[in-house]
């Protein structure tokens, strides 16, 4: 018997419950903590970056991706946990069986904030017309101290004009 996360209605939260949780959890957002980022290794925006990337995170917006957007880097890295046999809901997202999500790398990250930002997008790319929009949730080049996210920013600047856009030139 196959179970899918969208079929587990008993574990899903209502819209009102999600809004109440978000309002409460936003009070506890980190200020300058390093959190783990899960990287899509096959995307051109992540050329030269490892699978897991430290992200400097402050009180930044929490990005969600729609159907037509790509979440290139997500908050939290999967760690094995054999005790978990079913999908679990963490606010608006689900965790697969046998996996747990590690958000904090260093610094103060309250559990409420970790749940709020878990599985959210740090870097997104979306096609719009003949171009694209690339969004960062934080500051990828903050004082030049975060070299991993600096690489993401450089890839966006250098490759963004050609990769992911419409290459045709019409007269």
What function would you assign to each model-found segment?
Residues 60, 64, 77-78:
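Active-site neighborhoods of enzymes that stabilize oxyanions during catalysis
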Residues 1-48:
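A glycine-rich, often tryptophan-bearing local segment used as a flexible ligand/cofactor-contacting loop or short
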Residues 23, 42-44, 48-55, 66-69, ...:
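Extracellular ligand-binding/catalytic regions of CAZymes and related secreted enzymes
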Residues 71-73:
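General marker for long, soluble alpha-helical cores
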């Amino acid at each position: 018997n196959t179970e899918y996360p969208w079929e587990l209605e008993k574990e899903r939260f209502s819209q009102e419950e999600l809004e109440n949780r978000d309002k409460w959890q936003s009070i506890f957002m980190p200020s300058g903590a390093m959190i783990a980022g899960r990287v899509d290794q096959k995307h051109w925006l992540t050329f030269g970056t490892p699978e897991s990337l430290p992200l400097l995170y402050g009180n930044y917006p929490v990005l969600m991706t729609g159907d037509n957007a790509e979440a290139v880097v997500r908050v939290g890295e999967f760690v094995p946990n054999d005790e978990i046999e079913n999908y679990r809901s963490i606010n608006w997202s689900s965790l697969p069986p046998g996996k747990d999500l590690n958000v904090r790398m260093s610094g103060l990250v309250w559990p409420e904030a970790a749940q709020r930002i878990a599985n959210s997008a740090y870097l997104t790319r979306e096609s719009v017309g003949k171009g694209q929009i690339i969004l960062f949730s934080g500051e990828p080049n903050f004082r030049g101290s975060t070299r991993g996210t600096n690489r993401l920013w450089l890839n966006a600047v250098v490759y963004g004009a050609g990769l992911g856009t419409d290459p045709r030139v019409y007269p």
